[in-house]
C-alpha cells in the first residue's frame, strides 16, 4: 500500500478505494507522507463521504497534523461548509488554534462557516 495511492483516493473522493485500503488493514489514524492523517486530506479536499467513513472507522477528529492543523481547521481554511458542519456535529474542537494563532472562527470570512462555528 503506497501512501501516494491512498492519499490520491482520499483527495479525489474514491470511497471504494479508501474502503479497500482500510479493509486491508490501513490505520485511519496513521500519519501519511507529508505529515498529515487521512482525515486531513479528506477535509482539505471537501470529501464529505470519505470524512464520514473515516470517522465511522475511528479516525481521531481532533488529531493535529505536522503543522498543528486539525481536520476542522483544514475544512475551514478551504471553505468546505458541509465538511465543517459534519466535523462539528461529530464533536470537533472549535477552540483549537492553528499555527497562525487563530481559531477556526477567526480564520474565516465565510459567513456560513462563521454561523456554524458560533
From Swiss-Prot:
SMART domains cross-referenced by the UniProt entry: ANK (SM00248)
The keyword Nucleus is assigned to this record: yes
Keywords: ANK repeat, Cytoplasm, Nucleus, Repeat
GO cellular component, one term: perinuclear region of cytoplasm
Any single biological process term in GO: positive regulation of protein metabolic process
Subcellular location(s) per record: Cytoplasm; Nucleus; Cytoplasm, Perinuclear region
Pfam family, one: Ank_2
Start and stop residues of the ANK repeats: 1-30, 34-65, 67-98
Free-text function comment from the UniProt entry: Regulates NF-kappa-B transcription factor activity. Promotes growth of cardiomyocytes, but not cardiomyocyte proliferation. Promotes cardiac muscle hypertrophy. Plays a role in the regulation of the growth of actin filaments. Inhibits the activity of the F-actin-capping protein complex.
Sequence similarity: Belongs to the myotrophin family.
Protein's recorded name: Myotrophin
Species of provenance: Gallus gallus
Gene that this polypeptide is encoded by: MTPN
